[in-house]
């Protein structure tokens, strides 16, 4: 039954009142348009940070491939259950590093040579069962619409109406680890809730007709890698392939989901999401969050410097730290300094758990909205939600 105009007006008023308490921290309004333009941020970044070196980028590929090969050879030679868990953790992290380099290829920050980017991107992403062009195109949509409730592509919030329609079991799974950390393969096939399409089919709503050849090429490469894994299973046994490749692959998926989620969620400041005329590329990009991963920063190519990356994805990863330092005086309070990590970023697990307890949906109404909490989802949400008000 359609809502009356009066009911809609009441809902809008309630949403604004609910969000008002979330909006200000120490007098700072995170949802207010910043006093600077994106050109001001761009001008603060040193000129050399924009330069791409294909040789330097290829060096990182060679380095990571050498580490992956060495780890695989060592684990296969020792073949000990005392070693396998350590191998899975380290090799899975290296698979994730492959993703980040392929991600740079997709943005064109790897080099100015589109052919080189495509070749390297396909090799790296096909190895970890990602259709390179299919993902590249959807990720471009994510960057072009970051922070937009309706148009963002990945990890965008559920509206309250859509959230209420989810079956109880679906709600529980979505916000209960480890399921949220295993969603990426499903996303490749089915996209996010409320969106249709697959990253493998050129007929998907994700793509335009001109993308057809690229999508078919990447899906073919994905199928070749899958066939290779099946052949290895026949030759050496499925258990050996599971130990050498399958478990590290799952670890890399967990890294991918953890990092991409926490770059857009979990900050104590309760960052805004936008609709309509309130959204802009700059305001959407400023809702992203930098994270510190300790000594893993260098292993996964400084992916934690996410704010500047989202504003200027063409900057190579090896310049992102310097570019971030240069831009911080311009960004001011719109840049949130990441919590300093220990050697291992174990603190981020607490951030993830807290966010999953309180960040459930946004209002159906309003152009500047904030995550709200379903207090009935589990017994621990209420206290956490009240602490944030």
UniProtKB/Swiss-Prot annotation:
<feature type="transmembrane region" description="Helical">
    <location>
        <begin position="173"/>
        <end position="190"/>
    </location>
</feature>
<feature type="compositionally biased region" description="Basic and acidic residues">
    <location>
        <begin position="1"/>
        <end position="26"/>
    </location>
</feature>
<protein>
    <recommendedName>
        <fullName>Fatty acid desaturase DES3</fullName>
        <ecNumber>1.14.19.13</ecNumber>
    </recommendedName>
</protein>
<feature type="short sequence motif" description="Histidine box-1">
    <location>
        <begin position="103"/>
        <end position="107"/>
    </location>
</feature>
<keyword id="KW-0812">Transmembrane</keyword>
<dbReference type="Pfam" id="PF00487">
    <property type="entry name" value="FA_desaturase"/>
</dbReference>
<dbReference type="InterPro" id="IPR005804">
    <property type="entry name" value="FA_desaturase_dom"/>
</dbReference>
<dbReference type="GO" id="GO:0006636">
    <property type="term" value="P:unsaturated fatty acid biosynthetic process"/>
</dbReference>
<keyword id="KW-0276">Fatty acid metabolism</keyword>
<dbReference type="InterPro" id="IPR021863">
    <property type="entry name" value="FAS_N"/>
</dbReference>
<dbReference type="Pfam" id="PF11960">
    <property type="entry name" value="DUF3474"/>
</dbReference>
<dbReference type="GO" id="GO:0042389">
    <property type="term" value="F:omega-3 fatty acid desaturase activity"/>
</dbReference>
<feature type="transmembrane region" description="Helical">
    <location>
        <begin position="58"/>
        <end position="78"/>
    </location>
</feature>
<dbReference type="GO" id="GO:0102988">
    <property type="term" value="F:acyl-CoA 15-desaturase activity"/>
</dbReference>
<keyword id="KW-0275">Fatty acid biosynthesis</keyword>
<comment type="function">
    <text>Delta(15) fatty acid desaturase capable of converting hexadecadienoic acid into hexadecatrienoic acid (16:3(9Z,12Z,15Z)). The double bond introduced occurred between carbons 15 and 16 resulting in a terminal double bond aliphatic chain. Can also convert linoleic acid (18:2(9Z,12Z)) into alpha-linolenic acid (18:3(9Z,12Z,15Z)). Involved in the biosynthesis of the aliphatic side chain of sorgoleone, a phytotoxic secondary metabolite playing a direct role in allelopathic interactions.</text>
</comment>
<keyword id="KW-0472">Membrane</keyword>
<comment type="similarity">
    <text>Belongs to the fatty acid desaturase type 1 family.</text>
</comment>
<feature type="short sequence motif" description="Histidine box-3">
    <location>
        <begin position="306"/>
        <end position="310"/>
    </location>
</feature>
<dbReference type="GO" id="GO:0016020">
    <property type="term" value="C:membrane"/>
</dbReference>
<keyword id="KW-1133">Transmembrane helix</keyword>
<keyword id="KW-0443">Lipid metabolism</keyword>
<feature type="short sequence motif" description="Histidine box-2">
    <location>
        <begin position="139"/>
        <end position="143"/>
    </location>
</feature>
<feature type="transmembrane region" description="Helical">
    <location>
        <begin position="81"/>
        <end position="101"/>
    </location>
</feature>
<keyword id="KW-0560">Oxidoreductase</keyword>
<feature type="region of interest" description="Disordered">
    <location>
        <begin position="1"/>
        <end position="29"/>
    </location>
</feature>
<keyword id="KW-0444">Lipid biosynthesis</keyword>
<dbReference type="InterPro" id="IPR012171">
    <property type="entry name" value="Fatty_acid_desaturase"/>
</dbReference>
<comment type="pathway">
    <text>Lipid metabolism; polyunsaturated fatty acid biosynthesis.</text>
</comment>
<feature type="transmembrane region" description="Helical">
    <location>
        <begin position="222"/>
        <end position="242"/>
    </location>
</feature>
């Amino acid at each position: 039954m359609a809502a009356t105009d009066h009911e809609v007006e009441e809902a809008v008023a309630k949403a604004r009142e609910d969000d008002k308490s979330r909006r200000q921290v120490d007098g700072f309004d995170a949802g207010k348009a910043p006093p600077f333009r994106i050109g001001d941020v761009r001008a603060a970044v040193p000129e050399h940070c924009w330069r791409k070196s294909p040789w330097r980028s290829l060096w990182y590929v060679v380095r990571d491939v050498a580490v992956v090969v060495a780890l695989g050879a060592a684990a296969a030679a020792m073949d000990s259950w005392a070693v396998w868990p350590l191998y899975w953790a380290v090799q899975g992290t290296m698979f994730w590093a492959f993703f980040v380099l392929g991600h740079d290829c997709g943005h064109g920050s790897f080099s100015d040579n589109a052919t080189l980017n495509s070749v390297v991107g396909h090799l790296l992403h096909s190895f970890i069962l990602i259709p390179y062009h299919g993902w590249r195109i959807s990720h471009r949509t994510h960057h072009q619409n970051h922070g937009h409730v309706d148009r963002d592509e990945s990890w965008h919030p559920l509206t309250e109406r859509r959230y209420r329609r989810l079956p109880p079991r679906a709600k529980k799974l979505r916000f209960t680890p480890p399921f949220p950390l295993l969603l990426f393969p499903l996303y490749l096939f089915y996209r996010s809730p409320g969106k249709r399409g697959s990253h493998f089919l050129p007929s998907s709503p994700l793509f335009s007709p001109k993308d057809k050849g690229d999508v078919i090429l990447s899906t073919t490469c994905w199928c070749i890698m899958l066939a290779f894994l099946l052949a290895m299973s026949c030759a050496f046994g499925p258990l050996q392939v599971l130990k050498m490749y399958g478990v590290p692959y799952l670890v890399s998926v967990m890294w991918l989901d953890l990092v991409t989620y926490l770059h857009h969620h979990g900050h104590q400041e309760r960052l805004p999401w936008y609709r309509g005329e309130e959204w802009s590329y700059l305001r959407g990009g400023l809702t992203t969050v930098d994270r510190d991963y300790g000594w893993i920063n260098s292993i996964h190519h400084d992916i934690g410097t996410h704010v500047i990356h989202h504003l200027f994805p063409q900057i190579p990863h090896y310049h992102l730290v310097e570019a971030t330092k240069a831009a911080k005086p311009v960004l001011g309070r719109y840049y949130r300094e990441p919590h300093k990590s220990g050697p291992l970023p174990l603190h981020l697990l607490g951030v993830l758990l807290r966010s999953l307890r309180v960040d459930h949906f946004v209002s159906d109404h309003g152009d500047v909205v904030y995550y709200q909490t379903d207090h009935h989802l589990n017994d621990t949400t209420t206290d956490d939600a009240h602490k944030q008000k």
